[in-house]
Structure formats: structure tokens, C-alpha cells
């Protein structure tokens, strides 16, 4: 599924269904709903163009691909009662401008999330950017005004970019469960970029390794005295 927002246009896709309040979201095998997002696809979804696309995910997600979700360019405003942009296998942001407001995660994948460039502004009720596997930030600007945890994955790689995270819990977190329940090798690797974290919990928290070889890091907190600016095993 290729969605191109033509230059100079303003487009809107809205899911008017009431928010799903059940514990299991509608993409589960037992769900009676065929789809759970304003824009939904069983196959890959590719977004591009220089126009504006507003997406309102009233029921659950704003945009959800059961395969790979990729954004090449464009201007996006996404609100959702669950996740904002959800690529089950992978989520890749190559470029674009985003304003994402969600009850759950703003950017989410059961696989890998990669941010190559772009400007992403996030207000999230849960994680700002969450990968069940690996989260890569290569460049771009990520501004997280509010989140539970900011950047989370089993492995978090920050190679560049300008990142500001406000979180009620951990700012950058290497944690989570593997799909088969086995013990994961957690790691946070920071080799470049500018990272500012204003956390309620730990600023940087790895349940495994922490490797810092470059970049600029500023941690203002935590506000909760039971936590630490940096915590790793």
C-alpha cells in the first residue's frame, strides 16, 4: 500500500469508532474486528510526498501495518487511542515532519524501529518510541514532551540526531521480553548525537550493557529519589 500526499495538499483520514477499552487490542487472533487503525494494511505500507496527512485513530492505532511501515517524506499529524505509527515487523522513518499524540506508544514495532532523519514531536501516554527488538536513531530531531518511558528496546543504538526526552519513568531504557521468552542481551550504545533527558525515573537504564563512545549527554534528574541518572547491570 503506497500513500502519496501530493505537494500542497491537506488530507485527512479519521477512524470515528469509539476507543477500544478491552485488554487485548483488535489485531489479536481472538478479536472480532478486522482492522484496528485509521490506515491499516496486512502488507507493507509506504508513506511519501510533500503534502500534509492528518490521521485520527479513534478506535486504536493511527497507522498500522501487519508487515513493514516506512515513511519517506511528508508532514504528518497523528492522534490515536493506542499507538500512533505501528509497523509489526519494522518501522522506518526516513524523513518527514511528525506531530504524534497517543494514549499508548507514539512509534511502535514488535520488531525494529529505525529513525534515519526527520523531525518528530511526541506526546505519549506510554513509550515515545518502542521496539520489541532494536531501536536505532541515526539522525534527525526527536522532541518528547511527555512519555512514560522515552526510547525503549532490547537494544538501543543512538548514532546521531538531537533528542530531548521528558519521561515520568526511564528516559532511555534497554528492557523488554523476547518473543520466545528467552533471556535477552540488553544494551544501550551511544556513539553520537545530542541527548537531553528529564526523567522521573532513571535517565539511562540498561538491564545489560551500556557503551558510550561519543555524543553529548545531559540528564536533568531524576525527580524520583529512588532512581539514578545512569543505571546499568
Regions found by a protein language model. Give the residues of each.
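A composition-driven surface/loop motif
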Residues: 1-233
Amino acid at each position: 500500500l503506497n500513500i502519496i500526499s501530493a505537494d500542497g495538499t491537506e488530507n485527512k483520514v479519521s477512524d470515528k469508532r469509539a476507543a477500544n477499552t478491552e485488554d487485548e487490542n483488535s489485531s489479536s487472533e481472538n478479536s472480532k474486528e478486522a482492522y484496528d487503525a485509521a490506515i491499516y494494511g496486512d502488507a507493507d505500507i509506504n508513506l511519501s510526498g510533500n503534502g500534509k496527512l492528518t490521521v485520527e485513530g479513534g478506535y486504536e492505532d493511527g497507522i498500522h501495518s501487519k508487515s513493514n511501515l516506512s515513511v519517506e517524506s511528508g508532514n504528518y499529524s497523528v492522534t490515536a487511542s493506542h499507538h500512533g505509527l505501528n509497523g509489526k515487523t519494522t518501522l522506518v522513518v526516513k524523513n518527514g515532519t511528525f506531530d504524534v499524540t497517543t494514549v499508548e506508544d507514539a512509534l511502535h514495532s514488535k520488531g525494529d524501529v529505525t529513525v534515519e532523519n526527520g523531525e518528530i514531536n511526541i506526546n505519549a501516554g506510554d513509550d515515545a518510541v518502542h521496539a520489541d527488538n532494536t531501536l536505532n536513531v541515526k539522525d534527525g530531531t526527536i522532541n518528547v514532551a511527555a512519555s512514560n518511558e522515552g526510547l525503549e528496546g532490547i537494544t538501543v543504538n543512538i548514532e546521531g540526531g538531537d533528542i530531548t526526552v521528558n519521561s515520568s519513568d526511564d528516559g532511555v531504557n534497554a528492557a523488554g521480553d523476547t518473543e520466545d521468552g528467552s533471556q535477552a542481551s540488553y544494551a544501550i550504545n551511544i556513539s553520537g548525537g545530542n541527548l537531553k533527558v528529564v526523567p522521573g525515573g532513571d535517565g539511562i537504564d540498561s538491564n545489560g550493557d551500556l557503551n558510550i563512545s561519543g555524543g553529548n549527554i545531559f540528564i536533568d534528574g531524576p525527580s524520583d529519589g529512588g532512581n539514578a541518572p545512569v543505571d546499568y547491570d
